[in-house]
């Protein structure tokens, strides 16, 4: 069975609108994939700063970080779930990505260019946006970032499933937008 890794950066437990989209998609994907979920909560990973860079330069990267990066590099598919926060996504996701961006594990370079080392063929990004921003809007910065990361790591095609304008909608409109995103996501999951 192929391997799928889910990076869940949804910060609200019971009330996460993003997770309301994610969960039915994972049920569908579980029919074809062995799924490992990495749930970020802000306490797991330290920002990559001077100390971490000095440790890496000295050849020290914590074994758990290396093991996690190797699992991500070996995954056939990747799903990232995160709400739209402050024109991006929760900082914990960026910190996690920086920790997983390990030379000779997720990417390498030859002095003139880089090469992604991940075997992933597709990345599915699941999100909810309070604002009325569609994927591709100049203010929606996450999809372009994930496409750039995909080039660096070798993650393949980036597909975004989003429900928008949720902060300015009635409860019934929110439900309808989330239901539409779930339907779109389930259609994508058939071929993902």
Give the positions of each predicted feature.
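A short, flexible beta-alpha/helix-coil linker loop
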Residues: 10-12, 129-133, 165-169
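Short, glycine-/small-residue-rich phosphate/pyrophosphate-handling segment
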Residues: 109-153
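Hydrophobic residues at beta-strand termini and immediately following loops
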Residues: 38, 126, 161
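Glycine-rich phosphate/pyrophosphate-binding loop and the adjoining helix
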Residues: 135-136, 140-192
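N-terminal beta1-alpha1-beta2 submodule of the flavodoxin-like/Rossmannoid cofactor-binding fold
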Residues: 1-102, 183-192
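Structured loop/turn residues at beta-strand edges in well-structured enzyme cores
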Residues: 73, 91, 118, 153-156
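Conserved nucleotide-sugar donor-interacting segment of glycosyltransferase catalytic cores
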Residues: 100-112
């Amino acid at each position: 069975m192929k391997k799928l890794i889910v990076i869940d950066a949804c910060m609200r437990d019971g009330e996460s609108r993003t997770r309301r989209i994610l969960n039915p998609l994972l049920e569908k994907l579980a029919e074809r994939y062995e799924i490992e979920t990495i749930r970020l909560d802000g306490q797991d990973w330290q920002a990559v700063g001077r100390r971490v860079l000095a440790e890496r330069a000295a050849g020290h990267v914590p074994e758990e970080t290396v093991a996690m990066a190797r699992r991500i590099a070996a995954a056939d598919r990747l799903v990232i779930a995160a709400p739209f926060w402050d024109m991006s996504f929760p900082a914990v996701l960026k910190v996690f990505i920086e920790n997983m961006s390990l030379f000779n594990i997720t990417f390498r370079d030859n002095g003139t260019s880089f090469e992604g080392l991940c075997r992933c063929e597709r990345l599915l990004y699941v999100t909810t946006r309070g604002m009325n921003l569609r994927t591709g809007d100049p203010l929606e910065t996450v999809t372009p970032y994930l496409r750039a990361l995909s080039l660096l790591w070798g993650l393949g095609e980036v597909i975004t499933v989003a429900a928008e304008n949720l902060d300015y909608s009635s409860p019934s409109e929110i439900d309808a937008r989330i239901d539409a995103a779930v339907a779109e996501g389930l259609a994508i999951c058939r071929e993902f």
